[in-house]
Structure formats: C-alpha cells, structure tokens
Amino acid sequence: MQKLINSVQNYAWGSKTALTDLYGIANPNNLPMAELWMGAHPKSSSKIEDASGQVRSLRNVIDADKATLLGDKVASRFGELPFLFKVLCADQPLSIQVHPNKKASEMGFAKENAAGIPLDAAERNYKDPNHKPELVFALTPFLAMNAFREFSEIISLLQPVAGANNAIAHFLENPNAAGLSQLFASLLNMQGEEKSHALAVLKAALDSQHGEPWDTIRLISEFYPDDSGLFSPLLLNVVKLNPGEAMFLFAETPHAYLQGVALEVMANSDNVLRAGLTPKYIDIPELVANVKFEAKPADHLLTQPVKQGAELDFPIPVDDFAFSLHDLSPAETAIAQESAAILFCVEGEATLHKGGERLVLKPGESAFVAANESPVSVSGTGRLARVFNKL
C-alpha cells in the first residue's frame, strides 16, 4: 500500500490549467498537461518510494514479484499490470481513432515485425500484440464522438452537404454498411481540389445549420480547418457526458475525445489506427479493414453503473480492467480484490488502513495496493476511484 509518484504527459492538445485547478498539480513551465498516468506502462511507469526512501519504478517492483503483487490469476493471464489509469485533460480535439480487436492486433504486430518495420516508425500501426479497450468517466462536462450514428440520422445530416463529394451522393442512394465504408474511405482519401471543394461546401452549410452536430464541427474547425475529419460529426454520434457519466469504447469503433476532463482506463496497449483530425500517418486500407460499419444508437453508448452499497460499479465486457467508485464516510469499509488495485482520490480525503499502516490520499493523489494486501479499509469524505481486475 504505497502512494504513487505519477508523471504528466505534455501533449499539445492538453489543458494548461485543468490539473492545477482540480488537483493542485503545479505547472511551472506553463506546458499543456494532457494526461496524468497511473500504472506500470513501460513508456512512463509510476514510481513508489520504498521504506528506505529510495524511489523505484512501479514496473520494476512488480516485475520482481509478479505473483504476490498482481495475484496468481493476473500474473499468469497477463504477466504484467494489465491496465493504465489516466486523468485526461483535453483543451483541443484529439485525433479520431480506431483500436483493432485482439486477434487483429496479434496478426498486425506479427506482420509488421516480419516486414522489418521499426517500432518507432511513423508508418507503424501495431506497437504491441494487445487490444485497447477503454472506459472514460467524466469529471467535467466531456465532449466526445463515439460510433456511427443510425443510418437514418446520417442520411438526414448529409442532405445539406450532398454536393460536397460524389461518395456522399452515392451513400444517400445506397445507405448501407458497404456504402458507409466507401464514404468513410473516400472522405479520408480526398486531396487537392476535391478536398477544398468538399470543405467549402461543408463550411457554407455551417452558415445555415444550427445546434448539434454543427456546433461540434465549428469547434473542431478552430483547430483543424483543413481536415476531412470535419465531416465526422455527421457520421459519428456526438456525445456529451455529464460529470459522473461513463462510456465504454469498443474495438473497431471510431471515436474521438474533443474537450473536457475525464478519468480514462485502458488495457496496456499503444495500438491506434488514426482516422482524421491529425497530421500523423493514416493507413486508410488498414483502418477500413478494422472498422465495423454498423450503427450504435447514441442512447445505448453510456455505461450504466450498478450500485452496491457505497460502491458504484461500471460493468464492462473485458477483463483487462474493472472500474468502480466508492463514496467515503467516516466509518471504515473494506475494499477487496484478488488483483492489484490503483486507488485515486477524486474529491475529499481518503484514509487507507491495513494492519498498522495508514495512508492519506488528497484529491489527485493515488495509491498502489498489491493483491496480497487485500482487503484494505477506507474511510474519509468524498469519492475514491478504484481500478483493478475481476478474474
């Protein structure tokens, strides 16, 4: 049971103020602070201070005794802490992304290795053989896009821009999965005059269209005025999460985070296929091969939590991680799991007890609890978020 020393990722889209305003994390160099990472990811592992005062990488500590710290089931199934926990602070839209499923990730990783493509190459799609399921939990109002709209909605929204590109007219005549696939690829493939014309038609439509998703297109255009991803809000659900709402992001489903602060939990993977709103490499054939061109109604996208006493559990369809929130009270309650856990103080103050040990977490602080330390007692005020495994 040890407090974590976590790193901040200074990606350009991050907020310069959110982590300071919410959690008092200093920003002396006035850099964008996009993500606070909690976990043992090789790119940027959290650290802990041991009894002798020595600071050590959490990844190295776990590697030295996986079965004890992770639990036998997690150690044998994953061989590492299988999740990464983040506070994500988006001031600007992130790229539209698709994550391949587990089988496609394994095959793509092996294929690119066999082709001799370096892991750090710009054209590399698969950085590891794992899938990347994600859950996002809003701390502030959080704007995102997730999954294709109902086809009837797409048809209606495309009417004002029907003249932007032949693929739009074709989809309106053939509104099915094959037509959507062709439209998606055609918009990404646009170059030169074709792209200029399409974006001009879209921007002209903004003069007469109001509300959503046109407001989201206006927002994105402030940052990406010449990106064909500006058409995406017409195809994808625009989702506004209120604080306390959560959403699971499935494999093979386009999504993008646009603005706001959220907790994000994901499997340990860097496999991302980009699909717009980015200057980075887009492998369009690989992307289209890894997208399910099926509609998901917007009202089905939120993850409905299950309340069990003071715990709010968010059920998800994978075992790479589990996520729950705990309302704290002065009376101690036990938190137990057969895996390691990362506990994060969302608000208030949390006190953790185990044997003679006592650890206090203030907002924005987190702790690592090893599997062999379960259960721990918690008390305090406010809320505690827990990421762990149910195996």
Q: Each PLM stretch: what is its role?
A:
Residues 88, 236-249, 253-258, 263, ...:
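Short acidic-glycine-tyrosine-enriched beta hairpin
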Residues 48-49, 58-74, 147-148, 226-242, ...:
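A short beta-strand-loop-beta hairpin characteristic of the jelly-roll/cupin
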